[in-house]
Amino acid sequence: MGTNLPTEVGQILSAPTSIDYNYPTTGVWDASYDICLDSTPKTTGVNQQEIMIWFNHQGSIQPVGSPVGNTTIEGKNFVVWDGSNGMNNAMAYVATEPIEVWSFDVMSFVDHTATMEPITDSWYLTSIRAGLEPWSDGVGLGVDSFSAKVN
């Protein structure tokens, strides 16, 4: 399926997405979205800004950086982490309660991140990915459905 990314942030009306995860009760893992942005319309390489949304995690793992506050986005509560992974700025939103199924607008997270990072309307949304990061075990971890669209 084709994509209309990269797209300039200021030209995006909405970016609806939905996910349905399956979570095991064992292992060390996280289930997250990665939203990538850059000041240029990149299609390869490392982007300047990564936004991670941790829907759920298990074990003693955490995002890079340190917690900088709390926020509510589209009715869900998150602890916000800010840091760098050595290649780009990384902002992570860690859900305070597990989220298994959710439909939301990616731009809600882009807009919130732009209040703390140098993202402007002239930057580009380059990718939206959903996935799983099993650190150990994680049998049963899965995605039943995922969709994303940029309007």
UniProtKB/Swiss-Prot annotation:
Its EC number is 3.2.1.-. This is Probable cellulase Cel12b. The active site is at E50, E133. Keywords: Carbohydrate metabolism, Glycosidase, Hydrolase, Polysaccharide degradation. It comes from Mycobacterium tuberculosis (strain ATCC 25618 / H37Rv). Probable cellulase. Can hydrolyze barley beta-glucan in vitro. Could be important for the survival of M.tuberculosis in the environment, perhaps in amoebal hosts. SUPFAM superfamilies: Concanavalin A-like lectins/glucanases (SSF49899). Belongs to the glycosyl hydrolase 12 (cellulase H) family. One of its GO terms (molecular function) is cellulase activity. The keyword Secreted does not apply. InterPro entries: ConA-like_dom_sf, GH11/12, GH12. It comes from the Bacteria.
